């Protein structure tokens, strides 16, 4: 089954999305938005002209350079996932598709490509249970992460405004509106924060390796089979050379950092 590719029109939509995000982003001051947009367009051109795994990796490197200074964008992550998938690096593809999800929660192309990468990954493990808060805070997939942050901030500002009006005008109805705005903003902010923490602790194996019971070559293997490309796991701790993680369905183990992407 072929990976769902972006049409020319959809690719142009990505460019526009990227340009707008870059203009309004304050997360990266060292690189100007124009430079990021040029790198993004160049990466798309490299992807379209690619005929080998190395060509797709060249596109991926161009996209990685955009993210190197902390900039985040759903279109960049999505296309980075596409480039790694075509290069045969399924673990990195899965990781970047998942990073794109909070920015494009209802993108059917993204979801289809993620599922295809998961199916192709030789090291795929059992899916962990959904966090409890995704059931309680049920709007988790309704809005993108930036939208949640903006709505949370607006809710807090509305709450402050209504509280001020309550003091000035002495009307109980305004107090109820203030409480509602405060609760709504707090709930959205909490969900955005929990989602961010969950993403920060996600890792994936990028090449076959044996997990160990400790941080040294003399320790026993943690599992009876090697971990392979695409094995996702929860990062529990990390040192300069090793990562300790929980691998769903098989247990906990240490792996060297060169086999881990996060």
Give the label of every model feature segment.
Residues 123, 128-167:
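Membrane-embedded alpha-helical segments of integral membrane proteins
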Residues 184-210, 215-222, 246-262:
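Boundary regions of SH3-family modules and the immediately adjacent low-complexity/disordered segments
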Residues 227-257:
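SH3/SH3-like beta-barrel superfamily modules
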């Amino acid at each position: 089954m072929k990976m769902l590719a972006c049409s020319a029109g959809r690719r142009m939509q990505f460019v526009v999305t990227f340009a707008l995000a870059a203009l309004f982003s304050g997360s990266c001051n060292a690189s100007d938005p124009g430079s990021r947009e040029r790198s993004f367009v160049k990466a798309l051109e490299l992807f379209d002209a690619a005929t080998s795994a190395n060509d797709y990796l060249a596109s991926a490197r161009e996209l990685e350079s955009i993210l190197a200074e902390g900039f985040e964008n759903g279109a960049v992550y999505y296309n980075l996932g596409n480039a790694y998938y075509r290069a045969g690096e399924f673990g990195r593809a899965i990781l970047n598709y998942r990073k794109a999800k909070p920015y494009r929660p209802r993108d059917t192309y993204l979801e289809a490509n993620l599922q295809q990468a998961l199916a192709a990954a030789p090291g795929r493990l059992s899916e962990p249970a959904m966090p409890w808060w995704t059931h309680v805070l049920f709007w988790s997939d309704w809005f993108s992460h930036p939208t949640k942050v903006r709505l949370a901030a607006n809710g807090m500002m509305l709450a402050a405004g209504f509280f001020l009006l309550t003091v000035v005008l002495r009307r109980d109805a305004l107090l109820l509106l203030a409480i509602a705005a405060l609760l709504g903003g707090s709930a959205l902010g909490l969900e955005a924060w929990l989602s961010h923490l969950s993403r920060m602790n996600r890792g994936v194996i990028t090449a076959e390796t044996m997990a160990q019971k400790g941080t040294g070559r003399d320790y026993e293997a943690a599992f009876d089979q090697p971990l392979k490309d695409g094995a996702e796991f929860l990062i529990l701790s990390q040192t300069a050379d090793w990562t300790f993680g929980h691998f769903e369905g098989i247990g906990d183990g240490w792996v060297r950092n060169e086999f881990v992407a996060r």
